């Protein structure tokens, strides 16, 4: 069934929340801990990771709960409001001593991650249930990726400026408003949408997870997406450090974000057309290859040619747009095909496991970047004014470019084995 333009665009508003939440913590939380609260780099990386690791456990549970409730839409509003409030709390805690400030961040971020799980999982599950047309889902994802690009551009480009002008607490409140606009907007715009009634799954959560993970096409898609999320998470975590220590201009963080995300506004429709002609797998492979080349080229940030770094960020952004569009359109196809094959709707469990994997990748990114900094001898401070040794500067550059490029390149292997594009039905064999 064809969806109205209002529904396609309105659903995409939820990506203001997912794009913002997927960007700002990875961009600002690690440097907030190391350069404002004075937390050691390795400990800060662990602090960023723990709440996201909690989401890895919680997301399948959220999927299971939303499967049993049936309607996904009410979760968007309730969890969305909680998400906005708790995010603001993350950056409004005490400034010291470092141990007390770190505990505040962990507790507030845990609450924030919990709310996000109960928003993101039902949100991701909706496309498979409101339309049975794979092409329609791709159109939905095209709008969604465009909105994600705007959200990343807006939040990633302006949040550092708000920090500079007004401080971290004001930034937390500002981002909270963005999250509220996205979650409430998606809830209102999808009013009246009919979610296809399919038998809910029976059995324990463990049994449902076993069934979902036994679908080969899902495993392949999930592995590729998680590895890419890890690479992108590392890249995002390095932006503030690259701007401050390699480009010698903290404001360059916003410019890098504009260069990285801006092209997505133009190329998302092109990736959609490419996938329509060549297949979603081909689109995913091509965009992944572009992202690899762009990430490698980001090593130019360590040279005296910052213009090349911005150009490389733009190239990486072109690839990144496709690596968001393709898998987000492929996931509902796999879930819907599995539902047709089994007669049981496990879409919530599929999306719960999917978002858990994405969360794990994005969470590990800053943590691993923090470890790379620690190995390089990075010096933490409370004012961001510490002089970094050569090893730390090298770690900043390598962690920002080479490490993400290698990880994203590795994701090409499982993508090549995805079969739904070729067979017309998902590989659901155990």
Language-model regions, residue ranges each:
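Membrane-embedded alpha-helical bundles of multi-pass transporters/translocases
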Residues: 1-430
